Amino acid sequence: MEQIVIETKTKQYPLFLGEGIIESLPDILRQLSFSKGTKLLIITDKTLEQLYLSRLCALLANDYDVYTYVIPSGEEAKSFEQYYACQTAALQYGLDRKSLILAFGGGVVGDLAGFVAATYMRGIPYIQIPTTLLAHDSAVGGKVAINHPLGKNMIGAFYQPEAVVYDIAFLRSLPEKELRSGFAEVIKHALIRDRDFYQWLRQEIRELADLKGERLQYCIKKGIEVKASVVREDEKETGVRAHLNFGHTLGHALENELGYGAMTHGDAVALGMLFAIFVSERVYNISLDYDRFSSWFRTYGFPVSIPKQLNINRLLEKMKGDKKARAGTVRMVLLKDIGMAEIKPLDDETLLALLRKFQREEGENDPRNSRCHYC
């Protein structure tokens, strides 16, 4: 079991990483001073309930009062209705300020359960137990939120967990599309801050099937280390932490416009990163070898163009709702070079022209468009 220290200006906490480490959870809780008899509320989703929940409850039942709340699987669960239902469950189970919430699942569960913890009785402890590759990003750094019909993650808080317990054995049950979705965030971390890691990914992860064993654990560790280094510098996203939104300006707009769940978060972010590289080459008058990136992304099955059915003007309006925007002006995270990110404001006219060009030029290269994969 590896241990990584996550450090911010307000808190320091451990991240435990390894195969089969969930069996050590009772010991970890004792190490974190959660005494016998503490009330635990496990928030998870339908998929994890069927696969692992009974095992997790049995693991903890000897030492703790264990309660559960199960949400629907999928992005739609990051809603006010589910948030309110979780709060109701916490009240009915009699949780107090010494109780603990366990966020057992992927990014949706982590975001929702973390926001429940941040606001229940003005804040109680929680621990992230991620079960997806995507959650290597969302489980670290304390950003918790639910969605609003007008925008993704618009209602939330910065609230750090007590710990992260990342057992990569859970990733074996992931379908290919979810593994691909999480890998997009791994690529993101390399592109914004670690050129050497980017080169390693190109050499070692030739296909999604390579994401297993030591390679998988290394990917997770490197991604977490990049995320931790950024969060250490900027916990509340006032500066460089916004670089972690590389690919998310268009990505979130696509998710919102298509309807949450129609396109996986990772597919949307991958397409957003490709567009950001496309824009970077034109804004900075440089070559990042865009065509090579497009081919590379395609080998993993990522979409490489904006679905032709989507209206570009509507997409722009969604992008203007991004949290990085200022006074109605879109601010995108671009690359000056691999490993060197920067936030750049872009006017509507420039963005519309680039969106249209990107949609037109890449449309013929993406087989998903021809069969209306998302629309």
Swiss-Prot record:
Zn(2+) binds at residues 185, 248, 265. Binds 1 divalent metal cation per subunit. Can use either Co(2+) or Zn(2+). Keywords: Amino-acid biosynthesis, Aromatic amino acid biosynthesis, Cobalt, Cytoplasm, Lyase, Metal-binding, NAD, Nucleotide-binding, Zinc. Gene3D superfamilies: 3.40.50.1970, Dehydroquinate synthase-like - alpha domain (1.20.1090.10). GO terms for molecular function: 3-dehydroquinate synthase activity; metal ion binding; nucleotide binding. It catalyses: 7-phospho-2-dehydro-3-deoxy-D-arabino-heptonate = 3-dehydroquinate + phosphate. PANTHER family: 3-DEHYDROQUINATE SYNTHASE (PTHR43622), 3-DEHYDROQUINATE SYNTHASE, CHLOROPLASTIC (PTHR43622:SF7). Belongs to the sugar phosphate cyclases superfamily. Dehydroquinate synthase family. This is 3-dehydroquinate synthase. The lineage of its organism: Bacteria, Bacillati, Bacillota, Bacilli, Bacillales. The gene is aroB.
